[in-house]
């Protein structure tokens, strides 16, 4: 399948257990309705809905294929930008952050760890409340906890955007797609991205191969 001319990497007809793929409404109007199911049952859900997926050599488990988010309160994206400026003014902030593209992210969802997520943006701008030109920002990651972040959504745009990637979990890495409109948040926690300080050595390490050879086969 495809959306707005972009093919969906997570599309498939049958899952890795041979079950036909089904469209599943997981959450509707903020209420949990269903789960992505493999053939391994859980309480209250006793059959697969075609989401048993795995990397070769690993056991299938319930995984996403194409995650599609829709909104009942959408506005044109030009209006969404103005709403970002208005929200910054309302909060007395000099600017809001506009995240134009991301390269991926990850979540911690096991019971033994804090429920948290991190998103890795590629292109981020400061959108100034006083009308100055947008300013590119580098080294910013989005962090937070899912439930707290979701309560801060003000509204969404009216255009669906596609992210294709690879998702890793206990059943390995599988291709997936996430489709969602742009979202306006009243607040979002960010942090400075860690940068490595390693530099390549100036000189080769002692005993490194020099590439020279003599007739005896012994390298100096």
Give short role names for the model-derived ranges.
Residues 1-220:
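Dual-mode signal for accessory low-complexity, basic/Gly-rich regions
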């Amino acid at each position: 399948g495809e959306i707005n001319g972009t093919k969906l990497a997570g599309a498939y007809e049958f899952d890795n257990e041979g079950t036909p793929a089904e469209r599943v409404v997981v959450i509707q109007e903020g209420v949990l309705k269903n789960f992505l199911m493999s053939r391994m049952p859980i309480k209250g859900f006793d059959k697969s809905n075609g989401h048993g997926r795995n990397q070769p050599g690993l056991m299938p488990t319930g995984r996403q294929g194409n995650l599609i988010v829709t909104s009942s309160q959408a506005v044109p994206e030009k209006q969404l930008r103005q709403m970002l400026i208005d929200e910054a003014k309302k909060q007395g902030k000099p600017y809001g952050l506009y995240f134009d593209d991301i390269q991926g992210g990850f979540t911690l969802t096991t019971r033994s760890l804090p429920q948290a997520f991190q998103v890795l943006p590629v292109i981020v701008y400061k959108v100034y409340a006083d009308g100055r030109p947008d300013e590119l920002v580098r080294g910013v990651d989005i962090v937070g906890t899912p439930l707290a972040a979701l309560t801060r959504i003000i509204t969404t745009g009216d255009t669906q955007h596609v992210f294709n990637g690879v998702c890793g979990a206990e059943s390995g890495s599988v291709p997936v797609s996430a489709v969602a409109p742009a979202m306006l948040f009243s607040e979002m926690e960010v942090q400075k991205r860690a940068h490595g300080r390693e530099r390549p050595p100036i000189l080769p390490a002692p005993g490194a191969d020099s590439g020279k050879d003599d007739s005896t086969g012994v390298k100096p």
